[in-house]
């Protein structure tokens, strides 16, 4: 947990819901460790024009052409924020190769779970 902190996923979702409510935002959560499920979800939301997508693609950042293609298509109509809890640029060399960054308006890395809250603040300020 050293790289990722101590907050469990259920608690994180509650905290994000509270933050979104305070900002008068609607948010939808989706999590999967299965590449195809992530791609299917991204493809299913392409109709939500002018929406924001906050994504922590984890290791798929460095490996998934399918996720890259889905985000490329999505980025034509929506804005994407990439969040990584740990600083992927200061970790292993293979993590320095980022397949999705070019489709993201901003990348927030190494800020712990606070990166998700920074993403909501960024959206709110736009």
Give short role names for the model-derived ranges.
Residues 2-21:
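Short catalytic helix/loop segments, enriched in acidic residues and glycine
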Residues 26-36:
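Short beta->alpha junction loops
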Residues 28-29, 76, 89-126:
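Short, glycine-/small-residue-rich phosphate/pyrophosphate-handling segment
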Residues 21, 43-47, 72, 124:
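Residue-level signal for alpha-helix termini/capping positions
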Residues 3-4, 70-73, 99:
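Glycine-rich, phosphate-binding/catalytic loops in enzymes
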Residues 37-56:
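Short, electropositive alpha-helical surface patch
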Residues 16, 41-42, 67:
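Aromatic/hydrophobic pocket-lining residues that form π-stacking "cages" and hydrophobic walls in ligand
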Residues 50-89:
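Mid-chain, well-packed structural core segment of small domains
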């Amino acid at each position: 947990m050293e790289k990722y902190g101590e907050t469990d996923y259920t608690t994180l979702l509650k905290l994000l819901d509270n933050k979104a409510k305070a900002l008068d935002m609607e948010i939808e959560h989706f999590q999967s460790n299965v590449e195809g499920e992530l791609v299917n979800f991204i493809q299913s939301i392409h109709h939500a024009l002018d929406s924001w997508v906050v994504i922590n693609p984890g290791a798929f950042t460095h490996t998934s052409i399918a996720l890259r293609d889905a985000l490329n298509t999505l980025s034509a109509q929506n804005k994407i924020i990439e969040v990584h809890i740990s600083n992927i640029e200061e970790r292993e060399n293979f993590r320095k190769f980022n397949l999705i960054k070019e489709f993201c308006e901003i990348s927030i890395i190494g800020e712990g779970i606070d990166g998700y809250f920074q993403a909501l603040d960024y959206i709110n300020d736009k």
